[in-house]
Structure formats: C-alpha cells, structure tokens
Amino acid sequence: MLFDVLRSFGVRCAGFIPLGDADLISKREYGFPEDAFVISFYLPYYTNVKSNLANFASARDYHQYYAELFRACESFMNEKHPGRYFRGFADVSPFAEVLLAAKCSLGVIGDHGMLITKDASSFIVLGEAVCGLSEDELLAEGISKGEGKVGGCTHCGECRRQCPADAADDKSRCISSITQKKGELSESEKDIIRKTGMVWGCDVCALACPVTKTAMKNGTLETDIPYFTEGRLGTVDEGLISSMSDEKYERYSFSWRKREVMIRNIRIASGTDFEGENI
C-alpha cells in the first residue's frame, strides 16, 4: 500500500481531501488534474537534546529526507498505478500546509499558528502530495479521508504566557523570525537573542503546549526515525560553525542562510555584538 511506503519513512498517519477543497497560496500554474486529491502527512522529529538551536534545526535538513520519501512514493506509483499523477511537496508548497493538514484531520491549529497532533504535538514537519488516484483507491492504499473541517486548540494561553519575546501579537518579535533575518539587527532584536540564548529558531511555545506535555508523558513525542536521531547537533559555537565543511554545513536547515548569519547570532547570544557586512 502507499501508506506502507509512507510508514517505512516514519509517517504515522495520512489523510486526503479533494484538490478543490485545498487552499492554494501560489499563483503558479502546476497543471494538477482537476479531479485529483491532496494527501497530507507529517514526520515527527523531536529528540531530547540540549541545544541553542531549535529542535528541528539540530537535526539534519528534513527537505533532503522528504526528497527520498517522494522518490520512493513515485517509484511505488509507477509500478502499481502507472500513468497516474503524483507530485510531492514539503515546505516550498503551493498549499497552506497547516490549514491543509487540519482539513485532512491530522490535528488542530494552535494559537501559535502551528498544527498540533496528538502523538507528536507540533514537533513535526509537514508534507503533501497531489495524487491522481480516486477516493476509493486512496482508501484502499491506506490513506484516511479527511473531514475537511479546521479545528482549533483549547486556547489555554500557555504558548502566549511563556513566549520570552511576547510575540503572540507581534510575529516580527518571534525568535525564529529574528534569528533567520539577514543584515544588522536592531537592539531590541539583539536583546531577545541575548535573553534566550537561542541562535536559530525557538521551541518555547511548542514545549509550553499541554499536548506536548501529554505526548512526552505517553512516550510518543520523540521520533524513532534514524535520519532525525543521528547526527544531531548540541550547543553550537562559533568555532564549530566556522570549522564545518560546506558539505556538512549544508546538511542542516540553517544552511539556507550564509554561515555569517549563524556566527552573528552566536556572538550576540554570547554578549559580543558582531558588526558584520554582507550578511
């Protein structure tokens, strides 16, 4: 089954809705079949590692893993359903991924804007695929039919209360956003990095969620996918980032920015401002 292929990569559940019910955010013409369905699924990535990187950033770049997953799915489709349409996306997607996943009944949308799943909370990376199989064929391939409804969280307010940057009402203050910015940061932005010590991304709002605490207690939060458990980075410093070969640096998702950005963040977090150029 198609779901067996997904499961072999660590996908725990997958759902689908008609293409017409999915929210497109791209004006690009992709040539999708009008009667196609969109499948949504996710990979859990959390491990209990102490780091000044967000949990996803301490693991190897998930985009590369998704590329392998999609190649395996395409091979399966070519063998079992030759000529049928299949195209996968992850992160760089024509769809509003969180909204799509919620409509596919994979979870609910939290006040922090991320999907919350029962087993892995928000420590997931989403993927989706446009597929030319019929509804009955998708069900036979082990993919569940989504309800098409968007549910919200319980609005307990923990993510808002625990955010160290008070970013609930001003996303420009979010540490994840600030640490990925190019150029010179404002003093208020630098203060946020100094306050938290984080040099790429942040997990505070996701860790604050009661669903995360329940998943942790139940033993479902941590991933068992070797790609995400092996090669993890702990606390990084300037020496480590500077000494990485280009090949190793590019294994991690923060490599979409030049390493000067990481070094800037590390210096700010350690209390030494970096007056860099061409960052």
What positions do the PLM features span?
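Extended alpha-helical surfaces
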Residues: 213, 220-236, 240, 251
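Long, compositionally biased charged/polar accessory segments in the mid-to-C-terminal portions
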Residues: 255-273
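Auxiliary alpha/beta "docking" domains used to position bulky ligands
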Residues: 1-152
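Active-site-proximal loop/short-helix segments
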Residues: 165-189, 230-236
